[in-house]
Regions:
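Long, contiguous internal "core" modules enriched in hydrophobic/ aromatic residues
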Residues: 1-313
């Protein structure tokens, strides 16, 4: 049965019935109008509820939920800034490695033989990559002036031009389907990262990129795929459940670990400092939110700040 539409007064009453403290209905109406009930309440209520009664813990206010929402909003902005930096590096490294091997003709990246065709699935995936994600840029008019310029003036769109218009998801797929020598050339750009490890990172980072781009809840997001085990998992003594590391595989800390390997050291230190500042601010501003709860949901071990104390290899 579909959930019924609720007016703002009904939404406020529903929250009060669940033990949320609201003393100013007019201010609460403005808040719900600005953020939207589903995005704000459904997205961020869990940390404030009693797991047994499903009601809000005593003293929880609408401002507490808004504070967590704003933390996540700022976390998305910070994360996306550095995701774009990694993305830019991967674009450059991929186009250079591919064109060094196969040349500047657009026919090179449209040729299935220039990808890894090993296995039952790869040939089909390569064909899908070419026909759905690469060829349309050449056979249809696009919104990218630089692509149209190369088509009309030069009759050729080299990969180093096209690659800027590709989504991070397509870029990740191109890496996954690349020949081993191309993957090796790209992974060498990053200290201590092997080909398979980079592929798993790109797959996970793509999911986080989509969460940021679509304003979804980020801090507690988990991907279905894992990043590969890394030396830092062991060096930081991340606890294990059997052979599986508990933290840093498909949670936000997996993204932090990936950034540690894929960002220049100076940039990672800046990112880490800004991240720590955000978490500390969220802890100070939210009386109902224990910092340990937030870190747990983000997949952070207690010693996460020591990530830069260890060598990456």
């Amino acid at each position: 049965m579909p959930k019924p539409f609720l007016t703002y007064p009904q939404q406020i009453q529903k929250l009060k019935d669940k033990n949320l403290t609201i003393t100013d209905n007019a201010a609460a109406t403005i808040t719900l109008h600005h953020y939207g009930y589903f995005a704000l309440i459904s997205g961020y209520k869990d940390l404030f509820k009693n797991p047994t009664t499903k009601d809000y813990r005593d003293g929880t206010t609408l401002d507490d939920i808004v504070a967590l929402y704003r933390f996540d909003e700022q976390l998305r902005e910070l994360t996306l800034r550095y995701l774009l930096q990694v993305e830019r590096h991967i674009r450059s490294a991929y186009s250079y490695a591919f064109c060094s091997q196969f040349g500047e003709s657009q026919n090179s990246y449209l040729d299935a033989n220039n990808y890894n065709l090993m296995g039952r699935i790869n040939p089909r995936e390569v064909q899908k990559l070419i026909t759905r994600h690469l060829q349309p840029f050449l056979s249809h008019t696009t919104d990218y002036p630089y692509i149209e310029h190369h088509k009309q003036v030069h009759g050729n769109v080299p990969l180093w031009v096209l690659i800027n218009a590709l989504t991070f998801g397509t870029l990740s797929k191109m890496y996954a389907l690349a020949q081993s020598k191309i993957q090796a050339a790209i992974s060498k750009e990053f200290v201590g990262v092997r080909e398979k490890q980079l592929g798993s990172m790109l797959e996970v980072l793509t999911k986080f990129r989509n969460v940021c781009a679509h304003n979804e809840r980020l801090f507690s997001y988990n991907t279905k795929n894992d990043i590969s085990d890394l030396p830092l998992h062991k060096k930081m003594q991340i606890p294990q459940n059997g052979q599986q590391y508990i933290y840093g595989k498909h949670d936000y800390f997996a993204l932090v670990l990936s950034f540690r390997y894929l960002l220049p050291n100076k940039d990672f230190l800046t990112y880490k400092a800004q991240l720590a500042k955000l978490i500390d601010k969220a802890d100070r501003e939210n009386r109902q939110l224990a910092g340990t709860d937030l870190l747990r949901l983000m997949g952070f071990p207690e010693n996460w700040k020591k990530i830069t104390a260890y060598k990456k290899v």
